[in-house]
Amino acid sequence: MKICAINGSPRKRGNTARLLSWALDGVKNAREDAETELINLYDLSFTGCRSCFSCKRVNGPSYGRCAVKDDLAPVLGKLADADGVILGSPVYFMGLSGMMRCFLERWLYPYLVYDAARSSIAPKRMATAMFYTMNVTEEQAGEAGLPALLRPMENFVERIFTRPYVLWCYDTLQFRDYSDYVAPVFDEAHKQQHREECFPMDLKEAFEVGHHMALGELREFDEHAREHHHHDHDHEHEHHHDHDHEHAHGHDHH
């Protein structure tokens, strides 16, 4: 079994990279013989789709695979026979990082068929997951419509492979020392507290994603998580006004 994690963040020790590392630890926890690899996109020199259409040419030598020869080519070769792929990206300007977007164009497009059946010619319908890290809170992300903006790419991943498990990591600690940067909108004390209280749970969830992916149980885990999140969301909504009242004079989260 081979499972790869794709880091779409420029930082190798940041929030996104840590989540991916924990996910791969979960893979190893489930199956010691599993082969895992963390690939940092920002170490590679590549572009998005070049629109050469070699992957679509009838009887062409590169039909169904990207013909561009650059640093991403061997990565795409590795992924072709992987059993699972975990994608991680920070949210930049309400979307994926540029490198992650470029990667997805190159990875997905060769397998997409222009037919009425919306066919996929991917070698495997492998398990997939997408991890998002962001500065905003869950409430702010919802108000801004972020889930709807990211969902189209999730749908393409599902069309080509399988429905991805989606992990949302909100309100991240962006700087080690906020006094070194001009960012007065953020409350560092709140950010630190949120990291101490919530980030360990995000890491645990990432670990569980890798664990269940390795066992072939990711879909069941995803369905259970969705049901649990829906229940928690309804419960939080019941006490929303009390929560707002308690924090009316507290930290500014915006």
Segments (PLM) and residue ranges:
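Cofactor-binding loop segments of dinucleotide-utilizing enzymes, especially the Rossmann-like FAD-
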Residues: G8, L41, F131-T133, C169
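Short aromatic-enriched loop/helix-cap "lid" or pocket-rim segments at secondary-structure transitions
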Residues: G48-C52, A141-E143, R176-Y181
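N-terminal beta1-alpha1-beta2 submodule of the flavodoxin-like/Rossmannoid cofactor-binding fold
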Residues: M1-A116, V185-D232, H237, H249-H254
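Long, intrinsically disordered low-complexity tandem-repeat segments
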Residues: H243-H245
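Beta-strand-loop-alpha "switch" segments that mediate conformational coupling across diverse proteins
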Residues: Y165-R176
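Short, catalytically relevant binding-site loops at active-site mouths
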Residues: Y92-M94, V136-T137, L173
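Short, glycine-/small-residue-rich phosphate/pyrophosphate-handling segment
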Residues: M99, Y111-L167
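The feature marks non-catalytic terminal segments
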Residues: I160, D180-E188
